[in-house]
Amino acid sequence: MAEAAITRYWCHECEQAIEEAMVDEIKCPSCGGGFVEEMTDEEIERLTNRQPEPGFSQWNPIEHPGETMDSDDEDNDLGREFEGFIRRHRRASTLRRVLDSIHDDLADDQERDSSILINAFNQALALQGSVLDPDEGQGDQGGSTNDDGLLEEYVLGAGLSLLLQHLAESDPSRNGTPPAKKEAVEALPTVKIEEVVSCSVCLDDLEVGSQAKQMPCEHKFHSSCILPWLELHSSCPVCRFELPSEETKDLNEPSNIGRVEDSHEEVRADGPGNVSESSNRPWAIVPWLNELFSTREAQNAGGVSTDQQSPHTSGTNPNAGHS
């Protein structure tokens, strides 16, 4: 009498054949799992001889959880690098907007027009008479110079912190209108708010029935907001209407801007001396922020003659020849 055929199973959890007869419950006697499948001898032989690639088993995340964690760590590292790139891009965009805003303020007052002096060889910035050298305090770097320094390196590279520090420590009146006269500030009327409007300084609403200071342009602000503002600026924060301003400088005293543009000796990093067009460390004058983000202009800044950039540097009188 022929023997009854033995039913064979394949355990998908421990990936081995099961030949023992199971009566009560079909499960793997080795691992106790119930994920078993009845198969023919050919199918079991094929599965037995198969060599799965490491990391591609369907149970690999369960059998080797550490590998999944490593993969997650790599994904997290990539995510952090991407977030860092986004943050740097946002900081650059924010800096650009700040500089553009400063440029707009300076453009409103022709008497306070400023300029940047860029040394394309030793990577130093001269802003309104102050020399900012990114390599200052870092010791001797072998005396080498960078002939390919671009303006972006000053703004977004080593000179970024120096530029921000200069802007933060500068006199606020240089970056806008001068302070308003105390008499003009004291003469501002205090009005009663009849409809809800927004204070443009703190962006909070002026409640109906409350008291507020009104500028001659009829813009209204909290007293605690507009009075400190007028101690630094004489213009309206909304429309830039100007009140009479305090004159804090002697008209006969030359300004820092004049010294920067009229004298190379005061801004040269290598000290006083005769300055000639054949100097191996030339300065090029670039209008304040107009060419700040122009790669081509910054790259060629070292080869531009200063007397072609500004009539002040060459000592030429722009009104010469006119009676």
From Swiss-Prot:
Changing residue 225 to A: Loss of catalytic activity. PROSITE patterns: ZF_RING_2. The keyword DNA-binding does not apply. InterPro entries: RNF126-like_zinc-ribbon, RPABC4/Spt4, Znf_RING, Znf_RING/FYVE/PHD. Its main location: cytoplasm. Residues 248-280, 296-323 are annotated as: Disordered. A zinc finger (RING-type) spans 199-240. Residues 259-269 have a biased composition (Basic and acidic residues). GO terms for cellular component: cytoplasm. Plants over-expressing SIRP1 exhibit enhanced sensitivity to seed germination and root growth inhibition by salt stress. This is E3 ubiquitin-protein ligase SIRP1.
